[in-house]
Amino acid sequence: MRHLQLMKYVNPRFAINTVITQRLMSKSDGKSSGTGSKDAKCKGTKDAKSSNAAKKSTEAKAKASDAAKKATPPKAAKETKVTPPKDETAIAGGSKCPPKVQPVAETSKNKKKLQSCDELLLGKSTRKQKKPLTAIQGGDLGCPGRTGKKPQIVAQHSKLWQKISLFGVLPMIAILTLLVFSTRSEEERLEFKNYEHMYRRTKRYWFKDGNRTAFHNSHFNALPPAGYEDEVDESGIGQDPETDKDKKARMKEFDKVVKNWRKHSSKRDAQLKKEAAAAEKEARKQEAQ
Amino acid sequence: MSTHSNHPFHLVDYSPWPLTGAIGAMTTVSGMVKWFHQYDISLFVLGNIITILTVYQWWRDVSREGTYQGLHTYAVTIGLRWGMILFILSEVLFFVSFFWAFFHSSLSPAIELGASWPPMGIISFNPFQIPLLNTAILLASGVTVTWAHHSLMENNHSQTTQGLFFTVLLGIYFTILQAYEYIEAPFTIADSIYGSTFFMATGFHGIHVLIGTTFLLVCLLRHLNNHFSKNHHFGFEAAAWYWHFVDVVWLFLYITIYWWGG
């Protein structure tokens, strides 16, 4: 190495040689260590002596390469120096490692194939087979609302619902009917007040008398503007309030009726007195006899 | 005609029912205009008669196609199912409008009503009397219609007959009790917003109970004529779906209008 360094200053050609040699040395060192590690990985079961022997062999190879470099001329040295390391490493690694790696890959591929086969088999069984659309409904075909499997009809379903219906639901209806109608009581109605929002009549109805609703109840439903039917004169319901003239006329008629009533009442009183007196006379005669 | 075809769909035959149905609907809505303006319901009644005759014969033809002619393949049945589902969805939204009106008024009653719910002058029903009995009746009818359905899927003819019979009977009983409640009501449809929303919601529910009862009765008659098999009975399933829908609407009605709003 020192000779080569000294030659730099004497002749520039040898400088190139030094650079190449340094690179080769570093490469050879790395490769030798790499091969050692590979050997150790591949030959895990071997002894330490065999590993030492491998190291010695690599050292010997390195020495041989160095000797070759010194002897050859510069041009020839370039060509020969590059090729040997590659060949050495390739031969050493290739022959040992593949047998261990390939089986693993093959087993994994086989497993994948097996899984895919299983999936295919399962998929066929689980896949829903759609019914042909041209199939006419009826017969032994499946239900229209369900695709694929026929529904597993179990007789217990209808029996279950029959029991629920006949022994659970219908008796409940009967019991509730008895409870409701036995505890039912008539409610009192509210006092009539002619609220603006109640008893709305914007037009007359097209049925009945035009003032009563379809489900009119004479006791509970009041009629505007008077109120409940059994509290007011029905003939006046829905009519306009009377005017002053009508009121005066009505009062005149009322006065006439009152006068007639008084006359008749006075006459009736006199007649009653006469009858009473006559009755007393007859009573006295009978007592005298 | 042969039942063989190279496609699963039902290419319908010529039929007069869409035309007569349209005529019936037009006559009905024209009759409503006449009714509201001239107090005359004759045209309205005529429209309803035309519509009823149309739907009867249209569904008769559908039953014949499915039962005797074998035209209801799996694909056709799927279409009928989606049709029924969408119809029930439209009914749900129909009732949402009544509940909306009720909650609009009941959650913030106006000052004119006394700022209270029920409004002043209203006595509400006792929810634990006949309304509770009606709730039990509808729930019971849900159980009996389920019994009929399971029996039908197990090819048990007599049990299906009994289940359907009890379901129809309970529907009629519900209607009778509801009519009794209407007659005994201490308020009318004209008594404030309470009476209006109450009778609109419960009235339309009552009409739907009548429709559902009729639907189930038709299924009972078809069953007695051996129209259904254990695999092909969508008409019955549609009636059961509709009946369960009516039941659920009543639960909402009972909880919100009778119980909470009472």
Swiss-Prot record, chain B:
- The domain of life is Eukaryota
What EC number(s) does this enzyme carry? 7.1.1.9
A Gene Ontology BP annotation from the UniProt entry: mitochondrial electron transport, cytochrome c to oxygen
Annotated organism of origin: Drosophila melanogaster (Fruit fly)
What is the protein name for this chain?
Answer: Cytochrome c oxidase subunit 3
> Among its keywords, does the record have Membrane?
yes
**Keywords from the UniProt entry:** Membrane, Mitochondrion, Mitochondrion inner membrane, Translocase, Transmembrane, Transmembrane helix
Instruction: Identify its membrane topology class.
Output: Multi-pass membrane protein
